């Protein structure tokens, strides 16, 4: 019988005999790498959730230049009025009971409501009592932020009753003081848009402006 000598491949050769076939065992040869698809991460929306007068409100917020800003309102609750001002640093919220709150992007809430008005004779007029006594009375209406520290709103104060004239009042946010612009007296007042001169106001059909300092100009 003829002797048969078999060659055994070493690990370095990475080859072996299988039956009569010489097989290359280097897995890297002929293999195909499958690239994983790149999935772009969609930034998740972020919200600031607050409660005003037992009503939840969600503000959509964003980060810009390392600063948190209010971008929009997810949904304005029924009979609420919301004005986002001050370049998104805060929002002014008027609830159905005519309370005014400033909501800051940080989550802080500041109530700047005029809870009562004290007349020249010292008599005290309480907001909720007046509103219950005179249906449709305007204590606070359509507040608009005219600067970082001031808010303008429309009111019937300082008079009480029915069929009253309207006035523009200014809130100083820091001191929470309210002051009337007497020259704004009118049957109808409508706040329009902000521009270079300030807040555009239609007063009985006449165009005026409220400056960032709270002054009424032509």
Could you describe each region identified by the protein language model?
Residues 53-72, 109-134, 185:
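Surface-exposed loop and turn segments in beta-propeller and other repeat-based domains
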Residues 63-112:
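Extracytoplasmic beta-rich ectodomain segments of secreted or membrane-anchored proteins
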Residues 97-103, 156-157, 161-171, 206-217:
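Structural motif
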Residues 77-83, 138-142, 185-196:
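Repeated scaffold domains used in trafficking and secretory/extracellular systems
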Residues 4-27, 171-218:
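Acidic, small-residue rich beta-repeat scaffolds with periodic aromatic anchors
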Residues 1-73:
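N-terminal, intrinsically disordered, polar/charged segments of Gram-positive cell-envelope systems
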Residues 40, 49, 83-95, 101, ...:
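Short beta-strand elements that form the blades of beta-propeller/WD-repeat-like
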Residues 138-187:
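Intrinsically disordered, low-complexity segments enriched in Gly and acidic/Ser/Thr residues
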């Amino acid at each position: 019988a003829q002797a048969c000598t078999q060659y055994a491949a070493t690990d370095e050769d990475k080859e072996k005999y299988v039956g009569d076939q010489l097989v290359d065992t280097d897995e890297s040869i002929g293999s195909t790498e499958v690239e994983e698809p790149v999935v772009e991460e969609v930034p998740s929306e972020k919200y600031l959730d607050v409660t005003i007068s037992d009503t939840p409100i969600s503000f959509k917020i964003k980060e810009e230049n390392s600063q948190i800003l209010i971008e929009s309102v997810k949904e304005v609750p029924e009979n609420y009025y919301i004005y986002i001002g001050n370049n998104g640093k805060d929002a002014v919220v008027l609830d159905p009971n005519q309370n005014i709150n400033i909501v800051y992007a940080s989550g802080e809430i500041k109530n700047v409501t005029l809870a009562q008005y004290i007349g020249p004779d010292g008599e005290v007029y309480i907001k909720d009592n007046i509103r219950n006594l005179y249906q449709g009375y305007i204590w606070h209406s359509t507040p608009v932020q005219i600067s970082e520290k001031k808010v303008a709103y429309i009111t019937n104060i300082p008079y009480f009753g029915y069929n009253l004239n309207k006035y523009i009042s200014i809130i100083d946010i820091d001191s929470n003081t309210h002051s009337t612009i007497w020259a704004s007296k009118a049957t109808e007042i409508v706040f329009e848009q902000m521009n270079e001169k300030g807040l555009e106001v239609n007063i009985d059909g006449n165009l005026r402006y409220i400056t960032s300092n709270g002054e009424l100009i032509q």
